[in-house]
Amino acid sequence: LNLFSNMRKIESQMNAAVTNRYNFSKANTQVSIDDRVASVYLHGNLIARVGDNFVQILDGGWQSVTTKSRLNALLRAVTPDGGVFQKDFTWYYNSSKTGTVPFFSGMEAV
């Protein structure tokens, strides 16, 4: 099973840029590399930072379906099992390490 099979093409391209640390820009999504840290932008708003030892996720000021989709695509590539979901208009982060916790912009994904 291909890891990226259920992802949008732009999300698999974004993940390749983050994983291999190269700059990428297509439509509303950009990846910028600075000192081995990949910064991911959606509509010009920072939604993630990925370093060799950390993953920081943000909502960029917009808790949209697209933001959540980009974050979940990225999390599938860079964390063992992290994910963002919404229940009753509230965002949550879930992983085997944290369980379900309220999402906050700037949190570290583990």
Show which residues each predicted segment covers:
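Terminal leader/tail segments of proteins
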Residues: 2-110
